[in-house]
Regions:
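Proteolytic-maturation and junctional protease-sensitive modules
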Residues: 150-214
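Tryptophan-paired
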Residues: 145-147
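Ser/Thr-rich low-complexity repeats and stalk/linker segments
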Residues: 73, 91-94, 124-143, 173, ...
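Gram-positive cell-envelope targeting signals
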Residues: 1-27, 175-177, 187, 209, ...
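Feature for mature exported/ectodomain regions
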Residues: 2-3, 17-136, 152-166
Length: 214
């Protein structure tokens, strides 16, 4: 089994399914609202419709076919496939979906130039961990669709499985750094035992996820 990541960051740490800390970002504010959903007036940019997948579609993750349970845009090119592995039957409860809502997701690569504020938090977390290799950074928007409109979710999470790049060192321990709007930063441990993949929890709403190796 892979080693479990254990680290103390220079901030208040709360143990749950992951280690949560506060890291400074530009224009950092308070945490997200506790409301279940917020209706947006329009759908967010879908970033490469050619990479759309339907719910239940077969996606190659680390060379192995995996069914992704959420429809959306899977545009991450820095990894060997990504798929939501939370069972479709569990999505409504996991994300507090109401009648008529269907889970939806948008995943794409980002970097220092595109996500400057979030990367400040990512780099601070890496430094607090004593250093780590940055493997890939993704922007992920986990929401829902209702009557053709995007619904922003604020509660719940799903499991996302990602195939590590071909050049990844499989002897290292992999984890993910999640940065949410406002600067809240969470270290997410790998939930699977496959040395060629990493599985972590994706929170409802928009977040930046940096996969690291240590």
């Amino acid at each position: 089994m892979k080693k479990v990541l254990a680290a103390t960051l220079a901030a208040t740490m709360v143990m749950a399914s992951a280690m949560t800390v506060c890291a400074t970002t530009e224009n950092a504010g308070s945490g997200s609202s506790s409301s279940s959903t917020t209706q947006e007036t329009s759908t967010p940019a879908t970033y490469a419709e050619a990479n759309s997948q339907s719910a239940g579609a077969s996606v190659k993750v680390g060379g192995v076919a995996v069914q992704t349970s959420i429809a959306g845009v899977y545009a991450a090119e820095s990894l060997k496939g990504v798929a939501v592995t939370t069972p479709a039957a569990d999505l409504a409860a996991a994300l507090s979906l109401t009648s008529g809502q269907k889970a939806a997701i948008i995943i794409y690569d980002t970097d220092q130039k595109k996500s400057t504020a979030a990367m400040v938090s990512v780099n601070a977390a890496i430094e607090a961990l004593g250093g780590a290799d940055l493997v890939s950074t993704l922007n992920i928007d986990l929401g829902a669709k209702q009557n053709g409109k995007w619904v922003t979710l604020s509660n719940g999470s799903v499991a996302l499985k990602a195939g590590l790049p071909k050049t990844a060192d499989t002897t290292k321990t992999y984890s993910s750094i999640c940065v949410q709007p406002g600067g809240a930063t969470t270290i997410l441990e790998d939930q699977d035992t496959d040395p060629t993949t990493v599985t972590f929890a994706v929170q409802a709403g928009l977040g930046t996820y940096a996969i690291i190796a240590k």
